[in-house]
Curated annotation (Swiss-Prot):
Gene Ontology molecular function: structural constituent of ribosome
Source organism phylogeny: Archaea, Methanobacteriati, Methanobacteriota, Thermococci, Thermococcales
Gene3D superfamilies in the record: Ribosomal protein L10e/L16 (3.90.1170.10)
A Pfam family of this chain: Ribosomal_L16
Keywords: Ribonucleoprotein, Ribosomal protein
GO biological process: translation
Similarity comment: family membership: Belongs to the universal ribosomal protein uL16 family.
SUPFAM superfamilies: Ribosomal protein L16p/L10e
Alphabetized PROSITE patterns for the sequence: RIBOSOMAL_L10E
Name the UniProt record assigns to this protein: Large ribosomal subunit protein uL16
GO CC field: ribonucleoprotein complex; ribosome
Amino acid sequence: MALRPAKIDRYVDKPAYTRREYIRGAPGPKITIFDMGNPAGDFEFEVALHVSQPVQIRQNALEAARQQVNRYLQKNVGRSNYHFKIRVYPFQVLRENPMATGRKADRYGNGMRRPFGKPIGLAARLKKDQKVLSIRVNRQHLKFAIEGARRAAMKFPVKCYYRIYDKEGNDVTTKILSQGL
């Protein structure tokens, strides 16, 4: 079955559906690596990507963003000069009630009889202003981290923004951007 458009699953309008012991045939997570680069490194800044409204992000989008950002940072910064972390996990099980279409669909389709749906994928539920991912780097690589966050934001079905934090966790976005990169 083809992958449905992300706009169908992005809204947080239904209750959470995460109890896997009740779900037959729930798919496994596609994203398995959450820490990339140098996790033990000591870095000056953290560039974090936040979502601007409550949303569900499918695991396909998270994995696409992870691959894109990791490849970009490895190429431009080097493996030991950054720590990239995905901060959400896809717990939400997405369901679909497949509707029969075409000639004589009424003969074999169920319509709205038992319409609960079958599991088709997983998604991460995010609240407003929640961090999706973070990239820790030193000052000389800050522009690459910001570009990586921008590239990741393109993969998500919601408007995102980034913030720059220092080691203590203080928001220094305006200070850094006013000084220039």
